[in-house]
């Protein structure tokens, strides 16, 4: 049985405060949240104080040069994100039942999703359903997982170290990674390069090349090549990592199929080793608790059909 104060809470709460609080957490500060929302800092501070008074809990620890969320604040943020995700679905859900398929599909993806199969699927769906719109957010794999968990994305495309228990994942495609250097690197014009010659070379890295990260096999490739410990440059973006490799900041790993055009253009050269290269899965991630709109249902059905109709071998790029 609900307590009296629990029954009053949703009626006493100014729901706009939840949106403000969510932005404060995501922007990691009151000043940045104020800029994002187009409001003044005192307005944001007052809203946060009102929300803390309403909930009866401190939500943000505010100290000079420090921003942290309390345990209560973390719980509230997760709930706010799910509420925001549900509300953001309403326009698409209200389109259900229209004679012509309408709605909006929100995609959360990592930066290095390069797949002819996915591109063909997207083209075919967009051509068949011209009234459906799309928005894509590019983020690290961890953030992609969070967006799908919080119901803020129709689905996600990302790397996974392990499949989250509350989500469903299917392999969209697989890709091999190799080491590359750019035209400004001393080894680029050398006729033949041995594995021993790249030992001790500086390198650039994806942020997820860690022991608990989804690109740990790539970190093992760097260790196998005995590159210099640590990295000289790091990024979560394939495009920025490629830029650093081409600019000669260091040797780095890229998906083989993503590097082909640059190899042909003389911007990249693959380095040893050439055998037993790491194979990494890119997943289609969905939330079984999400109430799908008609557009999302049809699109995800097309995704699963494409996965079923093409063998994993055919979806393995090298």
What residue spans do the PLM features occupy?
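Central regulatory/effector-binding core of bacterial HTH transcription factors
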Residues: 102-165, 318
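A short LG(V/I)-centered, amphipathic sequence patch enriched
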Residues: 52-71
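A late-sequence structural motif
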Residues: 117, 269-313, 317
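Secondary-structure junction motif
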Residues: 201-226, 292-294, 300, 310-317
């Amino acid at each position: 049985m609900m307590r009296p104060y629990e029954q009053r809470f949703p009626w006493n709460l100014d729901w706009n405060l939840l949106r403000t609080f969510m932005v404060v957490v995501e922007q990691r500060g009151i000043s940045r949240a104020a800029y994002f929302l187009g409001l003044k800092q005192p307005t944001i501070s007052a809203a946060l104080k009102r929300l803390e008074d309403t909930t009866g809990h401190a939500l943000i620890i505010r100290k000079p040069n420090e921003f942290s969320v309390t345990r209560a604040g973390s719980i509230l943020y997760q709930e706010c994100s799910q509420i925001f995700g549900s509300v953001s679905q309403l326009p698409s859900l209200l389109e259900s039942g229209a004679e012509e398929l309408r709605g909006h599909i929100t995609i959360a993806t990592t930066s290095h999703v390069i797949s002819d199969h996915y591109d063909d699927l997207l083209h075919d769906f967009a051509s068949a359903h011209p009234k459906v719109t799309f928005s894509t957010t590019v983020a690290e794999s961890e953030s992609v997982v969070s967006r799908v968990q919080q119901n803020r994305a129709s689905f996600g495309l990302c790397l996974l170290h392990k499949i989250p228990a509350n989500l469903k994942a299917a392999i969209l495609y697989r890709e091999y990674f190799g080491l590359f250097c750019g035209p400004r690197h001393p080894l680029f014009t050398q006729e033949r390069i041995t594995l021993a010659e790249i030992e001790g070379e500086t390198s650039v890295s994806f942020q997820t090349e860690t022991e608990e990260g989804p690109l740990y096999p790539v970190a093992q490739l760097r260790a196998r090549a005995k590159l210099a410990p640590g990295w000289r440059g790091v990024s979560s973006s394939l495009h920025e990592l490629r830029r650093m490799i081409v600019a000669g900041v260091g040797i780095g790993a890229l998906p083989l199929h993503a590097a082909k055009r640059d190899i042909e253009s003389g911007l990249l050269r693959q380095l040893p080793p050439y055998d037993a290269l790491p194979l990494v899965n890119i997943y289609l991630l969905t939330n079984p608790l999400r109430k799908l709109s008609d557009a999302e249902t049809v699109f995800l059905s097309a995704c699963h059909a494409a996965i079923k109709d093409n063998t994993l071998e055919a979806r393995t790029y090298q």
